[in-house]
Each structure stands twice: as structure tokens, then as C-alpha cells.
């Protein structure tokens, strides 16, 4: 008789052992990458790359395999053999192997782009999988660039893939970008957008820029023909508190897939000379209604600091300093309050939580539904700022001795809320929790969900 319980236990054991082996392999591979980076830095090489497999050869004809593989686009009248050869001899740099970069790279590799450069300093984690479609659970913890390379070579082994596993910055950007024909901005932060724009203007490289947030996406091509650059449209960066990335605002995976695929399309059009490139225009996608709009954007700014006839910026600058933001999409803590106006999460647990107080969670209702602290009441930040919460807590707010604690996901929105509430109730003790719910998980309760 089959012992089903024993078989199930054996299966569970094997799955656990396989997961442990994969994790060990990922750690070893990361150690190797770190060692190669150290060697690269010691020898003055700014790249983490794989050897050039085509030796810089200019292909003048297609192989039988090329013809069979790419036949459906070869028969397009405006594409043909010459279009495929241009793709085969082209190189595209994709900055960010996330929700935009993954589908863009997938379609470029599938279309027969000769060389792809993949830039990403980050590692694969579980929160990536719903939109970053080249990565897999088996490669959790692996460099995103390396993970994408594995998937792309399974799709098309003839595509040369170069991995740059370090953070793009002012010191290495020019060296890396100059070896590619087209650049795709698939990043999720303002500092990198300015860095890429300035480098592409200086090196005269077309820049295909995409973005996606919630159910919306945008796409345009900068530094192409007589079209404007990013600085022409945004000469001054926005304040840090006005910037929302997908880690804070959320995004539907299919929206990033839509924009990423269209970034690949624009890159192909630039390389092949196909159709009307999206320069001087902005494509806006509303995923909630599936509507596309195509609008004209301003022309080149005559006094642009980078792309004008007499530019003020002729070399790359410190973009994190210029933007007041980190060049990553990781937690970027704001510093809007003095230290005495803030509360450490452990101090809250040990002292304040045991006493009467009003704990206001300023996240959106959808986020509050995911997880919340005991006794927290949900008042979204927008309601705090427009004072619509006042009637709800009129009795509590009459007691000036009752501490008011503001809480959010990471400790950023709560600072904005504190500033506003303090102006309305200057006699109250009003503070926020440093690091928000992320800090609660990391320092107090590891079982508390993190997202």
C-alpha cells in the first residue's frame, strides 16, 4: 500500500533541498561577480562584460537560420533583408532590467538585435515577478542583468549579451554608453533620467524613454533628429516629495509590458529607419480605459543647458546632488522633520503603544487592507491634507494631552502629514514613526507582512 504521507514528506524534503542548492549556487555566482568586479576595478576596466563574440564584424548577409527565424518580419515591404541586417549589426543599451527593461530586451533579442547591453545593479526578488518577466523564482537573489541574460540566450543564442552589474553613474556612463547605437531608459528614478539624457546628448545617441505607474504609461524618444532632449522638457527636477515610483504608487504588470514592448518598437524603428519615430511627441497610455493619446511636446529649447548651440553643461555632473534624490528605486527616506519630531519604531512599541494615543495610518485604503497595526485608524494622506478627517476625530483632538502618531509604509508620507497636522494643532504632541511599517517588520515583528 502506498504511504501518501511519506511520499509527500519526501517531496517536501526534495523541494527544500533543491531550493537550498539554488540559493547556494546564486551565492557562489554573486561571489564570482563581486570578485570579477574587484579585478575589473583594480585593472581600471569600468565594465563588467562578457567577451565580444562577433569581433566587431559587420554582417553583409543573412544566414539560412536568420531567414527562417526572422521570416515574418523579413517579408514586410518596409523592413526586408536590409532592415534585418541593420538590426543584426546594431547594439542597444537597456538601462534597468525591471518591468520596462525585461519586455524591451525580450523583443529586441527576439527581433535579432546583434548586441544588447543590460545595466542593473540590483538583484532579483519576489516582488519583481509580477512584471519583470525575464526573471524566475529559481534565480531569486541573482543579479538582474545576469538573470535576464540567461533568459535572453534561451530565446536567441545568436544575440550577444553584455552585462553591466554596477550602478550607472557620472564616472562610468560615458564609457559604457559610447559603445552602443541606441539607449533605452527603463529606469525608475529622476537622477538616472537626467544622467542618461546628458550623456546621450553629448554622445549623440538616441534615447528611448519609457515610464509606467499604476495603470498609466508614457513613451517618447529624446535626442533624435531635431527633437528635444529631456532637459528641454524638464529643465528643473521636481522636488523629491513630489516623485512617486512604482514601489510607492504601484503598477500593473501588463502596463509595464505594454510600454516596454513599445520601447523595443521605437528602438527598432530608429535602427532600421522604419516609420515615424516618436521624437517631439509623447505617447500616453491609459490602461484603465485602454486609450492611447499622442501629443506634441515642445521643440528644442534654444537655451537648453545641454543640447543648445552653446551648452552650459559640457560634462556629466553629480545627478543625485542635482536632483536631491538617490539614483535608485530603493527606499529613499525623506528628511522633512527634526529628530525630536520623529519616533523610533522600538520607542513606539516600548513606550507610546502602551499609553493612550491616536495612531493615524496615512496609506491608501487598498494598502491598509493588506496589513495594519493594532488600533491604527486609516486616514489617507489626501484626507489629512484637506482636513476632511477633523470631524471624525473631533473628541480626540480636543484633548491636547493625547499624543498623535502618524504612520505610513516607509516613513515619508507620514512626515508630510505631521507638518500639516502640527500647523492645525500646535499644542498637541505630533510625531511620525521613522521608517514606517518597513521598520516595524525589520526591527519589531519579522512576521508582519512587507510589500
Curated annotation (Swiss-Prot):
Its main location: cytoplasm. ATP binds at residues 99, 120, 127-131, 144, 188-189. SUPFAM superfamilies: Activating enzymes of the ubiquitin-like proteins (SSF69572). It comes from the Eukaryota. The modification Phosphothreonine is found at residue 60. Its EC number is 2.7.7.80, 2.8.1.11. It is found in: Cytoplasm, Cytosol. It is an enzyme of class 2 (transferase). The keyword Amino-acid biosynthesis does not apply. One of its GO terms (biological process) is Mo-molybdopterin cofactor biosynthetic process. Binds 1 zinc ion per subunit. The keyword NAD does not apply. Keywords: ATP-binding, Cytoplasm, Metal-binding, Molybdenum cofactor biosynthesis, Multifunctional enzyme, Nucleotide-binding, Nucleotidyltransferase, Phosphoprotein, Transferase, tRNA processing, Zinc. Zn(2+) binds at residues 229, 232, 304, 307. GO terms for cellular component: cytosol. It catalyses: [molybdopterin-synthase sulfur-carrier protein]-C-terminal Gly-Gly + ATP + H(+) = [molybdopterin-synthase sulfur-carrier protein]-C-terminal Gly-Gly-AMP + diphosphate; [molybdopterin-synthase sulfur-carrier protein]-C-terminal Gly-Gly-AMP + S-sulfanyl-L-cysteinyl-[cysteine desulfurase] + AH2 = [molybdopterin-synthase sulfur-carrier protein]-C-terminal-Gly-aminoethanethioate + L-cysteinyl-[cysteine desulfurase] + A + AMP + 2 H(+). SMART domains: RHOD (SM00450). PANTHER family: ADENYLYLTRANSFERASE AND SULFURTRANSFERASE MOCS3, UBIQUITIN-ACTIVATING ENZYME E1. HAMAP family: MOCS3_Uba4. In the N-terminal section; belongs to the HesA/MoeB/ThiF family. UBA4 subfamily. This is Adenylyltransferase and sulfurtransferase MOCS3. It comes from Drosophila ananassae.
Amino acid at each position: 500500500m502506498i504511504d501518501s504521507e511519506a511520499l509527500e514528506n519526501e517531496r517536501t524534503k526534495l523541494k527544500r533541498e533543491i531550493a537550498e542548492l539554488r540559493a547556494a549556487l546564486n551565492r557562489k555566482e554573486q561571489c564570482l561577480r563581486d570578485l570579477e568586479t574587484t579585478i575589473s576595478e583594480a585593472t581600471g576596466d569600468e565594465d563588467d562584460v562578457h567577451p565580444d563574440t562577433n569581433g566587431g564584424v559587420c554582417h553583409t548577409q543573412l544566414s539560412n537560420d536568420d531567414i527562417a527565424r526572422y521570416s515574418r518580419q523579413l517579408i514586410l515591404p518596409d523592413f526586408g533583408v536590409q532592415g534585418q541586417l541593420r538590426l543584426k549589426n546594431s547594439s542597444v543599451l537597456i538601462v534597468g532590467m525591471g518591468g520596462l527593461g525585461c519586455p524591451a530586451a525580450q523583443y529586441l533579442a527576439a527581433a535579432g538585435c546583434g548586441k544588447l547591453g543590460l545595466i542593473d545593479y540590483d538583484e532579483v526578488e519576489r516582488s519583481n515577478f509580477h512584471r519583470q518577466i525575464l526573471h524566475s523564482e529559481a534565480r531569486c537573489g541573482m543579479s538582474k542583468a545576469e538573470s535576464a541574460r540567461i533568459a535572453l540566450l534561451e530565446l536567441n543564442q545568436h544575440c550577444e549579451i553584455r552585462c553591466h552589474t554596477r550602478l550607472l553613474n557620472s564616472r562610468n556612463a560615458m564609457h559604457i554608453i559610447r559603445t552602443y547605437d541606441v539607449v533605452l531608459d527603463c529606469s525608475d528614478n529622476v537622477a538616472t533620467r537626467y544622467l542618461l539624457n546628458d550623456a546621450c546628448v553629448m554622445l549623440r545617441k538616441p534615447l528611448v524613454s519609457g515610464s509606467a505607474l499604476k495603470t498609466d504609461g508614457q513613451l517618447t524618444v529624446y535626442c533624435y533628429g531635431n527633437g528635444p532632449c529631456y532637459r528641454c522638457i524638464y529643465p528643473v527636477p521636481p522636488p523629491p516629495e513630489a516623485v512617486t515610483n512604482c514601489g510607492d504608487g504601484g503598477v500593473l504588470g501588463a502596463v509595464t509590458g505594454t510600454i516596454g514592448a513599445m520601447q523595443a518598437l521605437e528602438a527598432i524603428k530608429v535602427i532600421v529607419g522604419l516609420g515615424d519615430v516618436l521624437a517631439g511627441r509623447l505617447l500616453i497610455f491609459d490602461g484603465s480605459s485602454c486609450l492611447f493619446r499622442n501629443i506634441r511636446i515642445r521643440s528644442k529649447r534654444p537655451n537648453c543647458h545641454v543640447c543648445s548651440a552653446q551648452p552650459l553643461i559640457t560634462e556629466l555632473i553629480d545627478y543625485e546632488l542635482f536632483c536631491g534624490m538617490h539614483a535608485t528605486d530603493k527606499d529613499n527616506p525623506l528628511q522633512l522633520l527634526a529628530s525630536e519630531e520623529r519616533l523610533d519604531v522600538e520607542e513606539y512599541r516600548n513606550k507610546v503603544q502602551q499609553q493612550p494615543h491616536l495612531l493615524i495610518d496615512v496609506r491608501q485604503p487598498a494598502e491598509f487592507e493588506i496589513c495594519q497595526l493594532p488600533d491604527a485608524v486609516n486616514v489617507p494622506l489626501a484626507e489629512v491634507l484637506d482636513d476632511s478627517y477633523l470631524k471624525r476625530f473631533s473628541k480626540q483632538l480636543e484633548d491636547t494631552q493625547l499624543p498623535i502618531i502618524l504612520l505610513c509604509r516607509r516613513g515619508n508620507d507620514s512626515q508630510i502629514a505631521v507638518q500639516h497636522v502640527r500647523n492645525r494643532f500646535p499644542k498637541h504632541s505630533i510625531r511620525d514613526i521613522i521608517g514606517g511599517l518597513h521598520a516595524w517588520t525589520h526591527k519589531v515583528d519579522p512576521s508582519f507582512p512587507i510589500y
